[in-house]
Amino acid sequence: MCEEVLLNDIWSFYFHDPYDSKWTYESYNKICDLSSAQEFWGLTDLIKEKIQFGMFFLMREHVFPCWDDENNKVGGCVSIKVLKNDVVQFWEELCIRVLGETLLTEKYKQLWNFVNGISTSPKKHFCIIKLWIKTQDLSLKDCFNLPKYYHGEVVYRSNQESIDTDHLKNN
């Protein structure tokens, strides 16, 4: 039996139905908490083929996957477009870099605690993978060691901008 490899933080894994238009706490399903590499690989085996069809969130335990969470409000999301054929591998490699704390480049690694999580959002022929960031200090593509197979530009959007846009749309 292998020795358990503990993560430096506990990470929570959520699912949100892509067809559910409600974005309330109740509309998210918390699947589990992960505290070891072995737990991550067990979960990965279960969801691997589903990752391109659902909205999944891997977040630090104390961070809820919504823009207006106290840990997300002043930060934003870095969005990466990944073609459907590459989503499973990209998601897996990105998760490994997040959980292993190797996502940030050398210049920015001291800001590691500002990485709140990652998520996936399915579209027709691709998925949008988002990095959830606590601060706008990590808004540049150069901050991250990203897997190479993504499509198009890496785009940052502040969560406050998303909150404001959503508020205008609903009023």
Task: Locate the predicted segments by residue.
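RNA-binding basic/glycine-rich loop and surface signature characteristic of RAMP-family CRISPR effectors
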Residues: 1-4, 35, 42
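Conserved NAD+-utilizing ADP-ribose enzyme module
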Residues: 1-10, 26, 47-49, 53-171
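N-terminal, Lys/Arg- and Ser/Thr-rich interaction peptides
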Residues: 10-23
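A short, exposed loop/beta-hairpin motif centered on an aromatic-Gly-Thr core
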Residues: 28-33
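Short active-site loop/helix that positions an aromatic residue
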Residues: 38-49
